[in-house]
Amino acid sequence: MENQKMPISSVPNLKDLNMISRPIANFPPSIWGDRFINYTCEDENDQTQKERQVEELKEQVRRELAATVDKPLQQLNIIDATQRLGIAYLFENEIEESLKHIYLHTYVENNCFEGSDDLYSVALWFRLLRQNGYKVSCDVFNKFRDNEGNFKNNLMEDAKGLLELYEATHVSIHGEEMLDDALEFTKTRLESVVSHLNYPLAEQVRHALYQPLHRGLPRLEAVYFFRIYEAHASHNKALLKLAKLDFNLLQSFHKKELSDIARWWKSLDFAAKFPFARDRLVEGYFWVLGVYFEPQYSLARKIIIKVFTMISTIDDIYDAYGTLDELKLFTKAMQRWDVGSLDQLPEYMKPCYKSILDVYNEIEEEMANQGSLFRMHYAKEVMKTIVEGYMDEAKWCHEKYVPTFQEYMSVALVTSGYTFLTTISYLGMGEIASKEAFDWLFSHPPVIEASESVGRLMDDMRSHKFEQERGHVASGIECYMKQYGVTEEEAHDEFRKRLVKAWKDINEECLRPYRVPKPLLTRILNLTRVIDVIYKNEDGYTHVKKAMKDNIASLLIDPVIV
């Protein structure tokens, strides 16, 4: 799309010009209106009754976990079900102890467990231990390969086992060629047999081929799994009822949170003040729910969603409206971080700058109350850094400069926003977000670079065509094509290879011994999962189509039937 002329009234400090050219993107408006502003509280007696039921069912599940302590396969199946149904957070200690016991008795002491010659059982064992940070060897799958290293022919008809092996391959790390082969083998075989399978296995296979479990959002996966689990005649009725009750209670909790945030957002009137920017509060809150949905992270969600809306607007000011001179002024103001800088800004920028300072002051007050004021230094630094990155990209766009791919990535990893969002996600997480944890994060460990890479590469793959149509800075796709003289499809192939590497980096960093507390690593993993879900086939944040609408409805509109 060509740059558009905007009336000079929008930038009163440039009165010497009659018209000014701006890179307007014409982003679609919000599709939600005021839908989430009004929240009707559930009847207090009903709420209390449901909470009582949840507590009773939790005790029942705890007893079942304890009763299977010497039956590892049964215990693994219960743990798998709790995770898939979205209620593992209710049993963190029990699951931790159970998996530790299973690891010590079936791996460290090299004891066999019931089903150790069954592909499904071994793959489930491997995946659950890996997901919990235990570096078990993929050599456990050697028994399923022939003398030439190929997977045995008798596995071809074991669709359930192949599906679990397929899921297990997604927790692989570097140097595990066997799992790379297993991924290709299982994917090819499952694609060929899915149409011949019965429900619910056929549906599970289709879903997994589209969205591998390890890369999906736990709460979204739970909504999908309710009906799959219920279709199994042998399902645990107490577990399913607990999961559904808890889902609905949490959904009400989230709707109340979103209602409060929506009223705050409307009071800012950004939709009117910044009509060129994406109005995506609800999509942003969905993003945040992907990072953490658990009730104990309510403060953390309230902090990050406010900052998220600010950075989304800033991104669009740099990307879809501001002139180079205006953006230089805004960048300087952000470096000063002072309300006195307001007078130096164009009129239209002032509400955004003032709101950023207000949001940060609000967070600072909360951090002071918690004795965690040190965190604000990191929160401000990442804001300054990402804005500098936006400025670099704006200069490239203005100069029509196409950097080398390496030069592009040095800036684009920053503007992916994932170091920024990870830092902000830690602010409300309590004592585990220590100064040492923030220093670790600012050392740019491999897991962060990998998460940034997934964010940047998937974003560029899905949005570069729309962006180039409107005169956007060259994306990674264009930079790679120009530098290496390859086609667009070849560039996409290279990006897909880099995504595979990045996910292996993330998996490796999530193995014990942990460099920081596991909940902090989980935020990075979940942020990466959000990108995989929202950008799987399109830029679902900018262009909100059926997939994104359905996902939001699943988590924030439609309760599940208990």
Swiss-Prot record:
Keywords in alphabetical order: Lyase, Magnesium, Manganese, Metal-binding
Record-linked Pfam families: Terpene_synth, Terpene_synth_C
Organism: Santalum murrayanum
Family that this chain belongs to: Belongs to the terpene synthase family. Tpsa subfamily.
Domain of life: Eukaryota
Cofactor(s) the protein needs: Mg(2+); Mn(2+)
Short sequence motif DDXXD motif: positions: 315-319
Major enzyme class: lyase
Function: Sesquiterpene synthase.
Gene Ontology process terms (BP): diterpenoid biosynthetic process
Keyword Signal (UniProt): no
Cofactor binding, per record: Binds 3 Mg(2+) or Mn(2+) ions per subunit.
Any further remark recorded for this protein: The oil-deficient phenotype of this species is not due to the absence of the genes encoding enzymes for santalene biosynthesis.
MF term (GO), any: magnesium ion binding
Keyword field contains Magnesium: yes
This protein's name: Probable sesquiterpene synthase
Record: residues binding Mg(2+) 2: D315, D319
Positions with a binding annotation for Mg(2+) 3: E467
Enzyme Commission no: 4.2.3.-
Binding positions (Mg(2+) 1): D315, D319
